[in-house]
Amino acid sequence: MVTKRVQRMMSAAAACIPLLLGSPTLYAQTSAVQQKLAALEKSSGGRLGVALIDTADNTQVLYRGDERFPMCSTSKVMAAAAVLKQSETQKQLLNQPVEIKPADLVNYNPIAEKHVNGTMTLAELSAAALQYSDNTAMNKLIAQLGGPGGVTAFARAIGDETFRLDRTEPTLNTAIPGDPRDTTTARAGADVASLRWVMRWAKPSGAVGDVAQRQYDRAAGIRAGLPTSWTVGDKTGSGDYGTTNDIAVIWPQGRAPLVLVTYFTQPQQNAESRRDVLASAARIIAEGL
């Protein structure tokens, strides 16, 4: 059975996936923010992509917003959204049991490994993928959608012409420079409906917001660069070439929600993750508001 908390999370999100909003305009101070982001990128030795959407007036800030970046585990948001969308017309879908076999386990399975030779529901798999970044759970969602192409097809159906998922976990994390597989852009990442249903329909104190907020502490990533009084729900991702990503919905005190996407990748395959770069990018954005 699906727990009440997970059921609320899934049903609320599934009922509320909206269409993409119109093209935003740019902040007047975008140039100054972009200069600071460029300086950060230069000092980091990698390539940085940033997109901010302020939902109060649909304005945005972009830095390398239309360049492709490997998504890594941030792609789990789109996969979970696609399953939630299916559940709109298949009312019992989220309660459907999925068998977990020993051969299903891959490189990171903190939840699925506890259910080997048993089952998990699609709701539980979605929660495991989003909250714990469980890679076996992600693969089960992908299988439910007919393979990576099914996730991409969902992206096209909601108006995202940029997102593409080509492989399963863990190979989707190879992040090879110039490889278009399993990539998107910061602009598309911020504007897709898979983030907008969280931002528009989940409150920071609600079930969806709760799951996102409990994923990671404030020690790294976007959260570390923002005021501690701001509520943040995010999904991180990392892979080869020091690829370090974080996508977030942010509820600042006294402001409408913000959607912030930060992607970072490096030229060396064995480079370390750089969540500090994402924190610095978030700090630059926050100071520019």
From Swiss-Prot:
Documented activity regulation: Inhibited 16-fold better by the beta-lactamase inhibitor tazobactam than by clavulanic acid.
E.C. no: 3.5.2.6
One GO BP: response to antibiotic
UniProt keyword annotation of Signal present: yes
Alphabetically ordered keywords of this record: Antibiotic resistance, Hydrolase, Plasmid, Signal
Signal peptide per UniProt: 1-28
GO MF, any single term: beta-lactamase activity
Active site residues according to the UniProt entry: S73 (acyl-ester intermediate)
Known catalytic reactions: a beta-lactam + H2O = a substituted beta-amino acid
Binding site for substrate: K235, T236, G237
UniProt xrefs under PROSITE patterns: BETA_LACTAMASE_A
Family: Belongs to the class-A beta-lactamase family.
Extra remark: The class A beta-lactamase family has a specific amino-acid numbering system, sometimes called Ambler or ABL numbering and often misspelt as Amber. A multiple sequence alignment was used to derive a consensus sequence and then the consensus was numbered taking into account insertions and deletions. This allows use of identical numbers, e.g. for active site residues, despite differences in protein length. UniProt always uses natural numbering of residues, hence there appear to be differences in numbering between this entry and some papers.
Role played: Hydrolyzes beta-lactam antibiotics such as penicillin G, carbenicillin, cephaloridine, cefoxitin, cefotaxime, ceftazidime, and aztreonam. Has especially increased relative hydrolysis rates for cephalothin, cephaloridine, cefotaxime and ceftizoxime.
Protein name (Swiss-Prot/TrEMBL): Beta-lactamase Toho-2
